[in-house]
Amino acid sequence: IQEFEKNKYSYVENILSPEVTNFCYNYFILKGCTNRNFSDGESDIVGKYDHKYLMGCHSDLVGETLLSQMEPIICSISKKNLIASYSYTRLYITGEELKPHLDRPSCQYSITLNLGGDSWPINFGVFDEDCDSDIFVDDRKVRKINSIVMSPGSGIVYRGEELIHWRNPLDADHCVQTFLHYVDADDEKYKEHKYDGRKNIGYKPFF
């Protein structure tokens, strides 16, 4: 908890049990390797991608169940009265990357969960115009402060609006990550982002 308050992120080993981790990993692998639509037809809500094999899903019901079940734990780590926003799961494959970015308001407090696959570091950084860096976000220099290799079942709780994060192109076969997003229920600025504008968790997005 102290680490989160100081650094705006905290790495937690074994936040999911091996049984839950294995179930979720195999569920999303099966979904990605069959003729089912991994994105459930909602791929346009996360922007346009050139990679024809992009597999990402907003509010998959397994992800939404994790979103609900993990809420008390994220509240405890953040020491905030949080309410669920939405879940998002990606099955990344060779060559895909997560470009340096800050998150939107619906991702005020988040956890990224490693469900399995190959090791793939996630990087965190802050704006620093005086640093020697070739990483930029909105034309501002970014200084990397840490790079973390997650193990299956582990999670990183982080402030996505305030902490720049990214992953370099994956040079292995695949990696499955689920992102659970929450907002501060006591902060008036974020109340409109409850359930990410949906009626409740589990519903498909309306935008």
Label the predicted regions.
Residues 94-162, 174-178, 185-200:
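Catalytic core of non-heme Fe(II) oxygenases with the double-stranded beta-helix
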